[in-house]
Every structure is written in C-alpha cells, then in structure tokens.
Amino acid sequence: MASLKDMRVRIASTKATQKITKAMQMVAASKLRRAQMAAEAARPYAEKMDSVISNIAGAAAGSPGAPVLLAGTGKDQVHLLLVCTGERGLSGAFNSSIVRLARERAYALMNQGKEVKFFCVGRKGYEQLRRTFDKQIIENLELRSVRQLGFVNAEDIAKKVIARFNAGEFDVCTLFYSRFKSVISQIPTAQQLIPLVVEAPAAGSVATSYEYEPEEDEILSTLLPRNLAVQIFRALLENNASFYGAQMSAMDNATRNAGDMIRKQTLIYNRTRQAMITKELIEIISGAEAI
C-alpha cells in the first residue's frame, strides 16, 4: 500500500494536471469562436464557386479543349490522397478520425489494384500514416510556423498538387479533412478535387443557358486552379475550427475526470490516515493496559 506521503504527492500532481487541462480548455474556447466564424464565412463562398464552375464545366466537359483539371487524364489508376490534419494533439479523436477515413479509402483502392500516394498537411497525420504508408508519402507539409491561416497557405498547397498532376504523378486527387458541425461533433469528410466532379442539375430544375465571353475553356483554365485553392483553404479553416472544438471538449472531459480522480484519491487518503491513527491509538491503549 502506498504511504500517505505518496498519496499526497499523487493528489498534488493530479491537481496540477487539472489546472493545465482547465487552462487549455479556456484557451481553446477563446480561439474557437474566431475559428468557427472563419469556417462558416468560407462555406458559402466555396460552395458557390464550386456551383458556378460546375455550371460552366457542364457545357465544356465534353469539348476537346476542356482543361485537364476538369477532364482528367482519362485514367484512375493512381490516386493522391491529400490528408489535412492538425499540428498538435490533445484534441480527442480529431486527427485519428481523418486518418482513419483516409486509411480506409487507401485500403479500398489498393484492393481494387490501384496505386495510392499520400500528400500530408499537418504533423499528426503524417506521424500516423508513416507507420503503414511510409514509402507512399510523397510530400509532407507542416504549418506549425503559421500564426494565422491565410489563403496564401492554401495556394501554396494547390500549386504543389497541380505541379505533381501536370508531371503525371497521379490521376485522381481526393481531399480529406474534418468538417466542423459543433463543439462535440466534427465530421471526417472526403472531397474529390481532381478531376472536378460536375454536379448534375437537380431533378425538375430548369436548365439555364448562358453565353460566356471568353469561351468556357478559357474561363475554366483560370478558375479551376483558383477553385482548387479555395476548396483547400475551406478545408484548412474547417480543420482549424474542428481542432479547437475537439480540444475544448477533450480538455473539459479531462478536467472532469481529474476532479473525479482527486475526490477518489482524497477519500482513500483520508480513510488510510484514519486507519493509521486508529491503529496507533489501539497500540497506545494496549500498551497502557499491559503496564
């Protein structure tokens, strides 16, 4: 059985840990609101841009001059999985849920005889994926030094992806990230970026015909690379909000668990101390009676 001194040290250590988790919870809560507002502000822009490009692409998809980012290579043999995770842990299942979705997709593709490559954005995703896919990770980009996420960060990632696509390194690119829903709910999401998936018009909707100047192919050659950066930027913002939401929830649970542990340890300490005092009193009384 542990001594009273060991118990006091353990209780003090748990209290110190509780202070840390409480502080981390408060920091995450303060950063969550701003991150949530940024993610929610980016959604309509990204969705509308995707919709507009899909509208233009619907007319240009079958033309011989359609941009390769829209038409694709004509094959789907080599898949690039662009996995965006966080730079830090202590955030519950935030990182592992994204990696799990990407890993499941990778195994499904490999079972079909496809080749899979990984482009990791974020240290935590890279650390988990390299255990099983070390030779298939072609690039790892960390954003630890970035104080404030900006569109320039997404543009940099998009340029690297497009450069590899133009070099013929892959046929299909799929983005993996966590969509923020609430503090307690973040949804791992997969979105195909290359070739662009053109959404079919809703059933019963009236198709609208537009005349474009310049031609659709020329417009798309400019918009498609930008749309790729926009979708990646949206994913980074969604990830940022999801991270702080998951961290706030995880640290709240950790703080509560620490409180429960402190109460249990204190109860054991008091009972042990009481038993020792009782034992000493019995020994004193027994000694006095013997005299």
UniProtKB/Swiss-Prot annotation:
Disulfide linkage: none
Pfam families with a match to the protein in the record: ATP-synt
Stated family: Belongs to the ATPase gamma chain family.
Protein's job: Produces ATP from ADP in the presence of a proton gradient across the membrane. The gamma chain is believed to be important in regulating ATPase activity and the flow of protons through the CF(0) complex.
HAMAP family documented for this protein: ATP_synth_gamma_bact (MF_00815)
InterPro entries per the UniProt record, alphabetical: ATP_synth_F1_ATPase_gsu, ATP_synth_F1_gsu, ATP_synth_F1_gsu_CS
Organism: Rhodopseudomonas palustris (strain HaA2)
GO terms (BP aspect): proton motive force-driven plasma membrane ATP synthesis
Keyword Cell inner membrane in record: yes
Keywords in alphabetical order: ATP synthesis, Cell inner membrane, Cell membrane, CF(1), Hydrogen ion transport, Ion transport, Membrane, Transport
PANTHER family documented for this protein: ATP SYNTHASE GAMMA CHAIN, ATP SYNTHASE SUBUNIT GAMMA, MITOCHONDRIAL
Subunit structure: F-type ATPases have 2 components, CF(1) - the catalytic core - and CF(0) - the membrane proton channel. CF(1) has five subunits: alpha(3), beta(3), gamma(1), delta(1), epsilon(1). CF(0) has three main subunits: a, b and c.
Gene Ontology annotations for the cellular component aspect, listed alphabetically: plasma membrane; proton-transporting ATP synthase complex
GO molecular function: ATP binding; proton-transporting ATP synthase activity, rotational mechanism
Subcellular location: Cell inner membrane
Membrane topology qualifier: Peripheral membrane protein
Protein name: ATP synthase gamma chain
Gene3D superfamilies with a match to the protein in the record: 3.40.1380.10, ATP synthase, gamma subunit, helix hairpin domain
